[in-house]
Regions:
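Predominant activation on well-ordered alpha-helical scaffold segments within soluble catalytic domains
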Residues: 54, 125-132, 161-164, 197, ...
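An extended, acidic, His-containing surface patch that forms the Zn2+-binding/catalytic region
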Residues: 271-342, 351-366, 372-466
Length: 466
């Protein structure tokens, strides 16, 4: 058979690929718990994006299935073995700091800007077109492909729990998720959130009325705001000095004898907390110089003096390193304090390697004398597919052939749908020289990378199912 130029095949379909991708990116598919009902398990946005994706697949001649608006799939080909491709249509909150409307896709200087451009609507569409090329060329295959799209990957994966329970099909035999980076992700750390709990008593000469920071546990808080009152001498001048020293932005608004203090850092993916600047921990550090008392003081001291830049849990004594999987990472992701509440929290999203466990981490955190600790019900254990597995070898071979770069295994702190299968990995779509803007303002994907990824996906899928 004549060798197929997958890059040329993508070139023929570039405009169609972008048109379909734009139609997905224009949908605000953030989870919205305030609008959850029986028809919209995570709010209307994720459902709308799922329906649009399945509409595209219907148009292209696939038989689709929507599993109660939690997730959906279509299948291609025949065979006893099934290759699963797992993607998602939900996105993290857009947040602030964008130069463009996050839901008006914008191409500028060879980059496509929008929330979801790189995580995960762009890679999903590239992978979809990779399979579409195989279908349209009529290439011979011996295995079935099930392309599965979820709507709750960025939160608790309740979409996949429901999907597998109700779809009436066995899990695919092997597969990948186009939701990370090349050359491959064949290992993922465990993922759990642990919560520190504080009371709200607040009797110092300085008073903390509220403290709020962070949108999601798996995002570094870009900004945080506290409402304070009392003895706060030279508050403005001290803030000016503080933000200049730490290269931050900040502001104070006065209203009815209270001060609303905001500090702005930089958001990032919670699996890579060191690449962000946690506005909440810096705000706590700034406020801790004033004379707060009781649980309010404890809250600020923990956040500002222990959690600040403690990306591997050293200060909390939970640090752990595995030779193959690397170091534990920790993101202090969501901060909620209200003086009228008896339960004020800091959410710690922890990505842990083999050799430790959520229960062990919790027992160490319980040594903190000023806070109680609870463990989220939903988590993921560490996952690893050996380099010798034919799935890993095939994907790396295609990557090497198309890029000329040496493939190698990688373990990440991020969690992808690849871990849903025992023989599951993540594969693209970010390249080693790409700029990672996932979960950040001004998220983008370079168009050249998008099209390169589509060609790699086309050849990789074909090699796996031919």
């Amino acid at each position: 058979m004549t060798a197929i130029d997958f890059t040329a095949e993508v070139e023929k379909r570039k405009e169609d690929l972008l048109a379909d991708l734009f139609s997905l990116l224009e949908i605000n598919s953030e989870r919205d718990d305030s609008k959850v009902d029986a028809e919209h398990p995570f709010g209307p946005g994720p459902v709308k994006a799922l329906e649009k994706f399945l509409e595209i697949a219907d148009r292209d001649g696939y038989s689709t299935k929507n599993v109660d608006n939690y997730a959906g799939h279509f299948e291609f080909g025949d065979g006893e073995e099934v290759l699963g491709i797992f993607a998602h249509m939900d996105v993290v909150p857009a947040g602030s700091g964008w130069d463009t409307d996050p839901y008006t896709p914008t191409i500028k200087d060879g980059r496509l800007y929008a929330r979801g451009a790189s995580d995960d609507k762009g890679p999903t569409t590239a992978c979809y077109y990779g399979l579409k090329i195989i279908k349209e060329l009529g290439l011979p295959t011996s295995k079935k492909v099930r392309f599965i799209v979820g709507t709750d990957e960025e939160s608790g994966w309740a979409d996949m729990d429901y999907y597998f329970e109700h779809v009436g099909l066995a899990k695919p035999d092997f597969g990948f998720s186009p939701d990370a980076e090349f050359p491959i992700i064949n290992g993922e750390k465990g993922n759990i959130t642990e919560y520190l709990h504080f009371a709200g008593e607040n009797a110092g000469v300085a008073r903390l009325h509220s403290f709020t920071g962070g949108l999601r546990e798996n995002m570094v808080p870009e900004s945080a705001t506290a409402v304070v009152s009392g003895d706060l001498a030279d508050l403005q001048s001290k803030l000016d000095t503080f933000v200049a020293e730490h290269k931050l932005r900040g502001e104070i608004q006065e209203e009815a004898g209270q001060y609303k203090v905001t500090i702005i850092g930089k958001s990032a993916h919670g699996a890579m907390p060191a690449s962000g600047v946690n506005g909440a921990t810096y705000l706590a550090l700034f406020l801790s110089q004033f004379d707060f008392a009781g649980p309010a003081k404890d809250y600020l001291d923990i956040a500002g003096k222990i959690l600040l830049n403690d990306h591997e849990g050293e200060n909390l004594k939970i640090a752990h390193v595995d030779e193959k999987m690397g170091a534990l990472s920790m993101n202090a992701g969501v901060f909620r304090f209200d003086e009228t509440s008896a339960d004020n929290t800091i959410a710690l999203n922890i990505r842990y390697p083999k050799g430790t466990s959520p229960e062990q981490i919790k027992s160490i955190l319980e040594n903190l004398p000023v806070a109680s600790v609870s463990l989220s019900e939903h988590g993921h254990t560490p996952h690893y597919v050996p380099m010798e597995d034919p799935l890993v070898q095939t994907l790396l071979n295609v990557y090497e052939k198309q890029t000329g770069l040496k493939g190698h295994e990688q373990v990440i702190g991020g969690g992808t749908f690849g871990r849903l299968l025992e023989r599951g990995v993540a594969y693209g779509a970010m390249f080693p020289d790409s700029i990672d803007t996932m979960h950040q303002a001004n998220e983008f994907i370079a168009l050249d990378d998008l099209f390169r990824a589509a060609a790699i996906y086309a050849e990789a899928i074909y090699e796996l199912i031919k």
